[in-house]
């Protein structure tokens, strides 16, 4: 039985090196989808590149941990910027949910303004949309807008409460990440999903060329290794041999 494989490159708009890596992995590799940070420093560059790559499906990478928000968020920002202290606020059950709801809507409208169309789907930077307090907001928004949502079902305990019309892949994997990136690792992700019986799978990735912005990231050089693996001709053949068809959330 043929299975759907969505290879989604996160962080479109983070930097020019990230943007070029994603485009390369789409044009000469197996990346079929990406998600864009509308407040990223290189988002305009990402928009420009995307015009020459119409086959690349583009979703929105909801941002609550980096850069400046599009709306006033006094309950989440420090000195006007977002940061990883959101984890502490979540643990303290002190997240400003109304502010987050407004910011989600603003980033969504900004995406449409930039790309001229709705995103194919939603996910988030550092997976913050999977926080128990935030997930219902994002799930409801995605269902209302008729777009798909990345769902990591491992930390999700209330999957029975999902909106009836919410679209997603059956499986999601973030395992293609870290210091041991290889073609074998990618194929193991597919084999694990097949054993679970997933008929559709999203694999998250971060292919990039190294630039000054990426150098500052804790996850730097493995992005270049990801790019090498994702553009391997042998990987594309191995995917087909396992009965997977490359696609995007438009196929879900």
Swiss-Prot record:
It comes from the Bacteria. GO terms for biological process: chitin catabolic process; diacetylchitobiose catabolic process; polysaccharide catabolic process. The keyword Membrane does not apply. GO terms for cellular component: cytoplasm. Keywords: Carbohydrate metabolism, Chitin degradation, Cytoplasm, Hydrolase, Magnesium, Metal-binding, Polysaccharide degradation. GO terms for molecular function: chitin disaccharide deacetylase activity; deacetylase activity; metal ion binding. Its main location: cytoplasm. Its cofactor is Mg(2+). It is found in: Cytoplasm. Its EC number is 3.5.1.105. Homodimer. Belongs to the YdjC deacetylase family. ChbG subfamily. HAMAP family: COD. Involved in the degradation of chitin. ChbG is essential for growth on the acetylated chitooligosaccharides chitobiose and chitotriose but is dispensable for growth on cellobiose and chitosan dimer, the deacetylated form of chitobiose. Deacetylation of chitobiose-6-P and chitotriose-6-P is necessary for both the activation of the chb promoter by the regulatory protein ChbR and the hydrolysis of phosphorylated beta-glucosides by the phospho-beta-glucosidase ChbF. This is Chitooligosaccharide deacetylase.
